């Protein structure tokens, strides 16, 4: 049975929006640098990397919607960090943002790399933004790039 994937192949031309929260800045900044490195490593020139900063995770979806109003934006990478507090605030934010980002990707036909950390502790977030567990900025960017390559092959 023939199969295809997006691990190799050509990328379409266009801009990639990297939309990142300023909240929990040290964690998000590390993920931004990792995502930018992944894009550069994949051959996306710096002038095609559109970095958009938003206040927090809640605003990621709005910025994706605005970025996708530009026809030359071929995909987005969303980066943020929500750390559990004493209330259920984090659960509401995490669910709403996750659901909306998936809906935006499906509706627009453009991939959205999901780099929203949903951690119980600051230490967990640090470990996932360049620590022992890796960097979700790389993972979100690499997933979006793979989906762009797959999309190119499926057309």
From Swiss-Prot:
Enzyme class at the top of the EC tree: transferase
Protein's GO biological process: riboflavin biosynthetic process
One annotated GO molecular function: 6,7-dimethyl-8-ribityllumazine synthase activity
Record key words, sorted: Riboflavin biosynthesis, Transferase
InterPro entries given in the database record: LS (IPR034964), LS/RS (IPR002180), LS/RS_sf (IPR036467)
Pathway: Cofactor biosynthesis; riboflavin biosynthesis; riboflavin from 2-hydroxy-3-oxobutyl phosphate and 5-amino-6-(D-ribitylamino)uracil: step 1/2
Annotated GO CC locations: cytoplasm; cytosol; riboflavin synthase complex
Keyword Heme attached: no
EC number in record: 2.5.1.78
Coiled coil: none
Protein name as it appears in the record: 6,7-dimethyl-8-ribityllumazine synthase
């Amino acid at each position: 049975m023939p199969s295809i994937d997006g691990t190799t192949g050509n990328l379409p031309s266009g801009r990639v929006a990297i939309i990142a929260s300023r909240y929990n800045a040290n964690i998000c900044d590390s993920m931004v640098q990792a995502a930018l490195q992944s894009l550069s490593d994949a051959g996306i020139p710096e002038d095609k990397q559109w970095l958009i900063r938003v206040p927090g995770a809640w605003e990621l979806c709005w910025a994706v919607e605005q970025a996708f109003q530009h026809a030359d934006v071929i995909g987005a990478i969303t980066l943020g960090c929500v750390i559990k507090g004493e209330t259920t605030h984090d659960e509401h934010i995490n669910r709403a943002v996750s659901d909306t980002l998936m809906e935006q990707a499906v509706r627009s036909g453009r991939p959205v790399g999901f780099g929203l950390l949903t951690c119980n502790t600051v230490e967990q977030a640090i470990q996932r933004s360049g620590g022992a567990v890796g960097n979700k900025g790389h993972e979100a960017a690499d997933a979006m790039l793979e989906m762009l390559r797959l999309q190119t092959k499926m057309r």
